[in-house]
């Protein structure tokens, strides 16, 4: 088919579509931005995943456990039990009732007490430390010696003669010689003696026989 001139002129005047710009630079820029974003997100610290395991066991409160044991804290010290309320002190015992005069007199004058009193007042051997210079024997010494002597009453050892003599003197029926008075009871005197030794100021040993008593008795 042949085209006329008019057709050519029509084709020559139809506008041709213009060439679109290339999209490759834009796509490349977008890819670069996405890679940078992924890199920044990958470098951020991640919290470690929690480990799976048995739950922690909580310490039981301190206190008394079955069997008399006591729970302990982590420090190893046992918790003291709460203080118990103090109990009131028991009342003091009631004082014994007062004894009548007769009972007290009977108790005070019992045979045991009378025997002890008589033994304390009776003739017996006694002992005491004394200085040698005080013996009156003329020895010069700075030492102390054990001096034993007899002392006490002998009223329970009086004979019928002693009892009669005391009665006559008390009634005035017996006139003793002037300047003297008879003794109406025995005397507590030593019955045995022992020697005593000591050192004088010249470092010389001295011994005195029959100086200290070893036994006593009522004589006379």
From Swiss-Prot:
The keyword Manganese does not apply. GO terms for cellular component: extracellular region; extracellular space. The keyword Disulfide bond applies. One of its GO terms (biological process) is neuroblast proliferation. It comes from the Eukaryota. Keywords: Disulfide bond, Glycoprotein, Growth factor, Secreted, Signal. It holds the Pfam family TGF_beta. Residues 1-39 form the signal peptide. Residues 41-121 are annotated as: Disordered. It is found in: Secreted. Ubiquitous. Expressed at high levels in peripheral tissues including prostate, placenta, pancreas, heart, kidney, pituitary gland, lung and testis. Expressed at low levels in the brain. Residues 99-121 have a biased composition (Low complexity). Residues 47-58, 81-98 have a biased composition (Pro residues). Glycans are attached at residue 202. Belongs to the TGF-beta family. GDNF subfamily. Growth factor that supports the survival of sensory and sympathetic peripheral neurons in culture and also supports the survival of dopaminergic neurons of the ventral mid-brain. Acts by binding to its coreceptor, GFRA3, leading to autophosphorylation and activation of the RET receptor. Strong attractant of gut hematopoietic cells thus promoting the formation Peyer's patch-like structures, a major component of the gut-associated lymphoid tissue. Homodimer; disulfide-linked. Interacts with GFRA3 coreceptor and RET: forms a 2:2:2 ternary complex composed of ARTN ligand, GFRA3 and RET receptor. PANTHER family: ARTEMIN, GDNF SUBFAMILY OF TGF-BETA FAMILY. This is Artemin. The lineage of its organism: Eukaryota, Metazoa, Chordata, Craniata, Vertebrata. The gene is ARTN.
